Regions:
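Catalytic cores of alpha/beta
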Residues: 41-67, 154-191
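Glycine/small-residue-rich loop that forms an oxyanion/phosphate-binding "nest" at active or ligand-binding sites
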Residues: 17, 21, 29-90
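Charged helix-capping and loop-helix junction motifs
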Residues: 28-35, 78, 118-123, 149-158
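Glycine-rich, proline-tolerant flexible connector loops at the mouths of alpha/beta enzymes
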Residues: 12-32, 72, 138-150
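Conserved, mostly hydrophobic/aromatic
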Residues: 7, 15, 47, 60, ...
């Protein structure tokens, strides 16, 4: 909750709140934390983790979420995307994708916190998700996540060029240039990071000034 307030004051454009083990542990997201975070952060808030039915989405939106992110449940039941988008609008539904490069080329989609390879092709799943009503894609590269050597520009660009909705690059940021590259070379509409900001390695204000100078 304190971090939500920190990011709000630091100039973040949006805050993504993930309960990363909710799907694996088969439980619902921590709604009490969300309620307090929404009170302190006056920027768009996306919430994800363990969201598997319409009632959960409704409750999260009422508690202050602006958008919900779905991953594993969408793969298990693609109609969940369609139903959610019809009920709440595509602008509320973010399709989260954890992808990893495949031997021989291309990328596979993983679920359950990156523990299970679905065998789905990343580009095909992104296109289907958008066709079913997802209004945004949050793309995390498992190859790059936590490494700090930059976002996965190849898969980011491939998916951004494939779909007609905003794509958010996630996983791999280590310096300011990586954000620039995600937006230019990778064709992403936005870039997400956690560790860099959590531990004060980069300041959001400095990053935004840098990106403005870079055009």
């Amino acid at each position: 909750v304190e971090m939500a307030e920190f990011y709000n004051q630091s100039g973040a454009d949006e805050l993504v709140f993930y309960d990363i083990t909710a799907s694996v542990e088969g439980r619902k997201i921590f709604t009490d934390i969300l309620t307090e975070a929404a009170k302190r952060a006056f920027i768009p808030l996306t919430v994800g983790g363990g969201i598997s039915d319409i009632d959960q989405i409704r409750a999260l939106l009422r508690l202050g979420a602006d958008k919900v992110s779905i991953n594993s449940p969408a793969v298990r039941n693609p109609d969940f995307i369609t139903e959610s988008a019809l009920r709440f609008g595509s602008q509320c539904i973010v399709l989260a994708m954890d992808v990893k490069s495949r031997a021989g080329g291309g990328w596979d989609v993983y679920v359950r916190g990156g523990r299970e390879n679905t065998g789905l092709d990343a580009l095909e799943w992104a296109a289907e998700g958008v066709k079913r009503g997802a209004g945004e894609i949050l793309l995390t590269s498992m190859d790059c996540d936590g490494v700090g050597n930059g976002f996965a520009l190849d898969v980011t660009r491939a998916i951004a060029d494939e779909v007609g909705v905003p794509v958010i690059a996630s996983g791999g940021a280590g310096k300011m240039e990586h954000f620039r590259d995600a937006l230019t070379v990778g064709h992403a509409d936005a870039a997400l990071a956690a560790t860099l900001f959590h531990f004060g390695i980069l300041k959001i204000s400095d990053l935004k000034e840098y990106l403005a100078r870079e055009g």
